[in-house]
Amino acid sequence: FATNVILEDFINNLPEEELEHLAFIAPDNGAVGRRDVYLNSFNSTSIDREAGSFIKKRDYNNLVDGKYPVIEHLYSGNSDLTGYTAIVSDDMISSGGSMFDVMEELKKRNAKKIYLFVTYALFANGIDKFDEYYEKGMFDGIYTTNLSYIPEEYQQKPWLHVCDCSKVVAEIIYNTA
């Protein structure tokens, strides 16, 4: 249900010309379904749409902190995203490691703008690296919800848009009571 709230805020905050060429990106296999929901929300014939996804190539010979490290993000989709606004959608940002790799890969493919759509922005490693990437022009914004705690100081960042889901949650509670 956060999809509609995030989309509404996104559309209301962007100039119409930024919505003409959209590339919907899944940062991994688990996010393909979510990517497709966003892709199908823009069914207008006046919008040029692309879809892409990344596959995480892991080093299965080394276990680091209980995980097999990602050694490369392999991209499947249009290799030239010149002029496209890329929308990367996932359930959450935990540390942000994969998102940083995805941003770099999309910039190599000439994405004009990059926005991240996530239901939960946990920022487990803080936001310093997000500040750094924003200052370097690696992404243009993160759209997330208020369904997880986001410190007030983080909410003041120009790149962070916190979408209010309280009405939707209240409706769900009301309709199931």
Segments the model singles out, each with a brief description of its role:
Residues 1-177:
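PRPP-associated nucleotide enzymes
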